[in-house]
Each structure stands twice: as structure tokens, then as C-alpha cells.
From Swiss-Prot:
Protein name (Swiss-Prot/TrEMBL): Uncharacterized protein YwkF
UniProt superkingdom: Bacteria
Keywords: Cell membrane, Membrane, Transmembrane, Transmembrane helix
GO annotation, cellular component aspect: plasma membrane
Alphabetical list of InterPro entries matching this protein: DUF5316
Transmembrane segments: 5-25, 31-51, 75-95
Source organism of this protein record: Bacillus subtilis (strain 168)
Coiled-coil ranges from the UniProt annotation: none
Localization terms from the record: Cell membrane
Membrane topology: Multi-pass membrane protein
Keyword Cell membrane among record annotations: yes
Gene: ywkF
Pfam families: DUF5316
Amino acid sequence: MKKALTAGILLIAIESMIGTIFPQALSYEAIFGVASLVLVGLAIITSGLAVSGSDQRANYHSETKEGRTSRMKMAAAFFVAAIPSILCYLLTILF
């Protein structure tokens, strides 16, 4: 999780640079918001939360325990990487 958090912090540094380079074209809210939505969306997709109950049951029975664990770790890493962008998005909206 430390690597995912570090990647998230690097991502907000890159997002801040993009916002500084293109101040008229992109707002900080848009940059942080889009990055947050993309990372949370990837976490939802990789975790399997966006499937129906019957699909989830079929995936559970056809998937190995190691595969399920690695998929959940990947989803958690995407979500942890999204946390800094979400916090920056909230800070730009509130202040």
C-alpha cells in the first residue's frame, strides 16, 4: 500500500504541474476530479463490484483464492492511489 500511496502523491504532483502549465484550459477541480473518478472506477472494475449477483457468484466459484486475493489487492491499490487526488479535489472545492 505504501507504493500505491506514493504513486497517488506523485500523481497529484503531476496533476498540479498540468494545472500550472495550462491554467486557462483546465481547472484544478477538473484535473483532480477526473483523476479521482478514473482511479475509483478502476478500483470498482478490478474488484468486481460492478457485476450482478449471478455473475459475482460465477466468478467466485470459477476463480482461485490466489486470483481473488491478487484482484482485491489491485483494487485496494487503485483506491489508495485515489485518496490523495480525492483530498486535493475536496480542498480545491472547499477553499
